[in-house]
Design a protein with these regions (language model features):
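Glycine-rich, often acidic, oxyanion-interacting loops/wings at catalytic, nucleic-acid
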Residues: 130-217
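A short, charged helix-loop
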Residues: 100-128, 166-178
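Phosphate-backbone recognition surface of nucleic-acid-processing proteins
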Residues: 218-222, 228, 234-312
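Gly/Thr-rich phosphate-binding beta-strand-loop-beta motif of the actin/hexokinase/Hsp70
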Residues: 1-19, 98
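Low-complexity, acidic/Ser/Thr- and charged residue-rich accessory regions of DNA metabolism proteins
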Residues: 265, 304-370
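Short, basic/hydrophobic alpha-helical segments
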Residues: 32-49
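Short glycine-rich, Thr/Ser-proximal phosphate-binding strand/loop in the N-terminal lobe
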Residues: 11-35
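Short alpha-helix plus adjacent loop in nuclease-associated cores
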Residues: 73-115, 266-275
Length: 370
């Protein structure tokens, strides 16, 4: 058997090779191009095990050769630190540490590194779309803040709701005779409107790409507060609820479970774990009032806990409760028990009508009944 630890970069990767029944160690660096990849392929086979640390290009990289080897393990960065691979020095040393960990795990049969699930191409595409989604939202927010700041500096104390309302935008553009102020406001307004248009086009593509997961979307949107886009975001993060041991594992992966440290009789509650994905909880946290108001049980619980817990703690706990319910819905493949048939039907009818505009993203299976 051959054990390969790979330290991956954007333009090259360094491999450390260890062998069964041998202390021999070989290290080689390949370019991340056609020539380098073919040279790498010649060094691996069906008796080869590979360990790669998860980075931005890892999933696309391992897809190239996963069928050529016995197994590819993609390791979570935070999890690697917890099992004793800190203090990175050089590419060769990094690759060697990974290879040693891999060999120890395979030879002993004792799992030391929990692998990261390599998402299918469709999920990777959704995640890429949502990365752009978050970038555009941040840029829109920054642009609005700058316009608001300019107006306040010049004694125009309008609220953001007024400034960026459709009716007031023309007035805001012509609000001052000062050339430089007017120039900046109009420049930023042009930028804002361009970003908003791009954002709308992006949402359209997200909805189209998410249509592959219609059954899950139909289940998730049965919960008050979850839109089609939020449902697609949850799917992009979790892939499949069946890969999680239980609801606690599911909630932890979505960064809603705090880390707990204890010594003797002292227990410290720390921030939520970072060894997971944060897209879903970011969008879900924006709809907490809808979740609370649409669920009498949650509403009573929030009122009770809010009497003796800080608002931030209650907010995160509510997120955790919602995520736990989402897990049960996906696991059991059933609608939310407080779902509103009228609102849910309206959401799904609008989505299916949207998809009907492009037959590429719509099948007879999901057609709207007359």
């Amino acid at each position: 058997m051959k054990f390969v630890g790979i330290d991956l970069h954007t333009n090259r990767f360094t491999c450390c090779y260890l062998f069964d029944n041998s202390t021999e160690k070989q290290t080689e660096t390949f370019g991340l191009d056609t020539e380098g990849l073919f040279s790498f392929y010649s060094t691996i086979g069906k008796d080869t095990y590979v360990l790669v640390e998860a980075t931005i290009n890892t999933f696309a990289f391992v897809t190239l050769f996963k069928d050529l080897v016995a197994e590819v393990i993609v390791a979570n960065t935070y999890q690697l630190k917890s099992v004793g691979i800190p203090g990175k020095k050089t590419d060769k040393l990094d690759a060697a540490k990974l290879a040693e960990k891999l060999k120890a795990q395979i030879v002993s049969g004792v799992q030391q590194i929990v692998p990261v699930t390599v998402p299918p191409k469709e999920i990777r595409a959704l995640r890429a779309l949502f990365a752009t989604y978050r970038t555009l939202r941040k840029e829109i927010g920054r642009t609005k803040n700058r316009i608001h700041s300019l107006l306040k500096e010049n004694l125009y104390p309008f609220t953001k709701e007024y400034i960026f309302g459709k009716k007031a935008r023309k007035e805001i553009r012509n609000i001052s005779d000062d050339y430089l102020l007017s120039f900046q406001i109009n420049l930023l307004m042009d930028t804002l409107e361009h970003l908003e248009e791009a954002f709308e086009r992006l949402v359209v593509e997200i909805k189209k790409a998410g249509s592959l997961f219609m059954p899950q979307i139909e289940i998730l949107t049965s919960m008050t507060g979850i839109s089609v886009v939020t449902a697609i975001a949850v799917i992009a993060d979790v892939i499949d609820a069946g890969r999680f041991r239980n609801s606690k594992h599911f909630a932890s992966y979505l960064r809603s479970v705090p880390r707990v440290e204890s010594s003797n009789d002292k227990t410290i509650i720390k921030s939520t774990t970072k060894a997971g994905r944060k897209l879903a909880i970011t969008l879900l946290s924006q709809s907490l009032n809808h979740f609370r108001d649409g669920n009498g049980k949650l509403s009573r619980w929030v009122e009770k806990v809010g009497k003796y817990k800080k608002k931030g703690i209650v907010r995160m706990a509510l997120c955790r409760r919602v995520i736990t319910e989402i897990y049960q819905m996906l696991k059991k493949r059933e609608y939310h028990y407080f779902y509103n048939p009228v609102l849910h039907g309206k959401k799904m009818a609008e989505y299916k009508k949207f998809l009907q505009k492009d037959t590429k993203y719509f099948s007879k299976e999901f057609s709207i009944s007359a």
